[in-house]
Amino acid sequence: MDSHTVSSFQDILMRMSKMQLGSSSGDLNGMITQFESLKLYRDSLGEAVMRLGDLHSLQHRNGKWREQLGQKFEEIRWLIEEVRHKLKTTENSFEQITFMQALQLLFEVEQEIRTFSFQLI
């Protein structure tokens, strides 16, 4: 896993948690929770790829890992749309920069998860 991506996750999550978006703060907290969940999932896939022969272990531990993988891609797509929406509706430049970086990070994570999953198939 790229240490830049890890620090990007931590930086964006910290900045998002400091934002005061009024009535939408519940939505933002949900996004933060999903970002954290996505990071953990990506990390676990990366670890599985790094251990040779771990596909059998992954399948045994989670018999429906392909279904879970599909759900994670749906979550990523949903988060991308949410971040795009927030980006369009905010006028605060700090928030715009944060959401632009979050969007870029989502694209990177989607690509990493795709790469990991292809290696596991």
Swiss-Prot record:
InterPro entries recorded: Flu_NS2
Predominant location: virion
A GO term from the CC aspect: virion component
Motif (Nuclear export signal): 12-21, 85-94
Highest taxon, organism lineage: Viruses
Family membership noted in the UniProt record: Belongs to the influenza viruses NEP family.
Assembly, per entry: Interacts with protein M1. May interact with host nucleoporin RAB/HRB and exportin XPO1/CRM1.
Its job: Mediates the nuclear export of encapsidated genomic RNAs (ribonucleoproteins, RNPs). Acts as an adapter between viral RNPs complexes and the nuclear export machinery of the cell. Possesses no intrinsic RNA-binding activity, but includes a C-terminal M1-binding domain. This domain is believed to allow recognition of RNPs bound to the protein M1.
Other remarks on this protein: Average number present in a viral particle is estimated to be 130-200 molecules.
Name used for this protein in its record: Nuclear export protein
UniProt organism field: Influenza A virus (strain A/USA:Texas/UR06-0195/2007 H1N1)
Gene expressing this chain: NS
